[in-house]
Swiss-Prot record:
It catalyses: tRNA(Glu) + L-glutamate + ATP = L-glutamyl-tRNA(Glu) + AMP + diphosphate. GO terms for cellular component: cytosol. One of its GO terms (molecular function) is ATP binding. It is found in: Cytoplasm. Its main location: cytoplasm. This is Glutamate--tRNA ligase. It comes from Mycobacterium sp. (strain JLS).
Length: 490
């Protein structure tokens, strides 16, 4: 399939919350399609009605939309190989099963698990070896007798009795030896198709040329190649796609990142205030890199450079600190207007209200853009503007609002009460004169008590700008309250 236009697919099952490893797979498929000018197909594997949910499906759509990973064919938009939800394709699978049986590529198997184990034990083999291909050559009479007993068969593919080898685009030449892979089930006993059937059949019918997926699926590849070869022989498939098995994503302690690990949950990162650019940049580094000396890049740059053969086969560790640092870099790369819009949307989504008008909010955003790692950090710096959220940090107050802060705050109040236009420049001039010149204080000793009294914290946006945003009346009221707190602590 080397000469065909690239067609890749992202085919999650709609169960649970989107996992960062799943989204990494989507990103690599998307980037490869965009790099090659190919097609990115989005398909939903919803054949397990007991586990699949519409809520999870909507969550996957939400994730793709938020990250900007647009697909060319799939649910919601359609395409030449619709439908793109497997639950709507059962007639297609039934037809393929019938054709495989008619061609002798697959057969009905009636053995129970207990019977298979008993045969292994009788032959002196490990009873847990799995299916033993016993039903391959049942006669019509034997099959009829099983049906008369009320047994429902599963359909199994007849595996070739030879090595199966392929050149994995990430891992190189890979071989599974003859006899290591028993005939495998394509359906359940009730006739429902299994993932082992529907995934390769859909890839064949949708003309998928490259399968980029997690390495946990590597052991299933020889079975799928055998099925592709059978599908070619019955005229369903044009060829066997190329495979690329992406490295595992590890969490703490060299364990594979699981859905139980908080950092695996895509939406927890969004809720903290990751922006798509930062998260996608970090996910791209889980197995790939744009250059040895460069970690920060945009999606357009990734598309221009990405080739799946450059993906590293070694496991990748999810490092939250590095992810945070990259997100901070991308926040700084946003224009001031874009950052303001992102921050305003984030605050609205999380119920944060600064009480500022648009111009004031833009100024507040400018003050915090270079001081945060995730958008959520901005609320910690700006919540002093919300009277309902303002709290005096006890540790900061114990350090800054002691008896020696009383004359500092008295002088600050006297200086500020004479300010005409309440602007950053006028506030700065008044405070520096009252405290640095008149009281001859060092800046930290002068401004520490004012910062804590006005913002409630020892860390805030620049002090003079913060007081302008807070406004004259609230600033003076908080300084008075801070002075009273310091006097009471004396």
């Amino acid at each position: 399939m080397n000469n065909m236009a690239v067609r890749v697919r992202f085919c999650p099952s709609p169960t649970g919350t989107p996992h960062v490893g799943l989204i990494r797979t989507a990103l690599f498929n998307w980037a490869y399609a965009r790099h090659t000018g190919g097609t990115f197909v989005f398909r939903i594997e919803d054949t397990d009605s007991a586990r699949d949910s519409e809520e999870s499906y909507q969550a996957i759509l939400d994730a793709l939309n938020w990250l900007g990973l647009d697909y060319d064919e799939g649910p919601e938009i359609g395409g030449p190989y619709a439908p793109y939800r497997q639950s709507q394709r059962r007639d297609l699978y039934r037809d393929v099963i019938d054709r495989l049986i008619a061609a002798g590529e697959a057969y009905e198997a009636y053995s129970t698990a207990e019977e298979v184990e008993a045969r292994h034990l009788a032959a002196g083999r490990n009873p847990k070896l799995g299916y033993d291909n016993f039903d391959r050559d049942l006669t019509d009479e034997q099959r009829a007798a099983h049906r008369a007993e009320g047994r429902n068969p599963v359909i199994r593919l007849r595996m070739p009795e030879r090595d199966i080898t392929w050149r994995d685009l990430v891992r190189g030449e890979t071989t599974f030896g003859a006899g290591t892979m028993p005939d495998f089930a394509l359906t359940r006993g009730n006739g429902e198709p299994l993932y082992t059937l529907v995934n390769p059949v859909d890839d064949a019918l949708m003309k998928i040329t490259h399968v980029l997926r997690g390495e946990d699926l590597l052991p299933s590849t020889p079975r799928q190649i055998a099925l592709y070869e059978a599908l070619i022989r019955i005229g369903v498939a044009d060829g066997v796609p190329e495979f690329a098995h992406l490295p595992s994503v590890l969490g703490d302690g060299n364990k594979k990142l699981s859905k139980r690990d908080p950092q695996s949950n895509l939406f927890l990162h969004r809720d903290r205030g990751f922006i798509p650019e930062g998260l996608l940049n970090y996910l791209a580094l889980l197995g790939w890199g744009i250059a040895d000396d460069r970690d920060v890049f945009g999606l357009d740059e990734m598309v221009a450079a990405f080739d799946v053969v450059d993906v590293n086969s070694n496991p990748a560790r999810f490092d939250q600190k590095k992810a945070d640092a990259l997100n901070a870099e991308h926040i700084r790369l946003l224009s001031e207007d874009e950052f303001t819009a992102r921050l305003k949307a984030y605050f609205a989504a999380h119920g944060h209200d600064t009480g500022l008008d648009d111009a004031q909010f833009a100024e507040a955003a400018r003050l915090v853009q270079t001081r945060i790692v995730v958008l959520g950090d901005a609320w910690g710096l700006l919540k002093f503007l919300d009277e309902g959220a303002f709290v005096l940090d006890e540790r900061a107050a114990a350090k800054e609002l002691k008896a020696d802060a009383v004359p500092v705050l008295d002088a600050a109040l006297a200086g500020l009460e004479g300010v005409g236009q309440w602007t950053t420049g006028a506030i700065e001039e008044a405070l520096k004169k009252a405290l640095l010149e008149d009281l001859e204080l060092k800046p930290r000793k002068a401004f520490g008590p004012i910062r804590v009294a006005a913002t409630g914290a020892s860390v805030s946006p620049p002090l003079f700008e913060s007081l302008e945003l807070l406004g004259r009346d609230r600033s003076l009221a908080r300084l008075r309250a801070g002075r009273d707190h310091a006097a009471a602590a004396a």
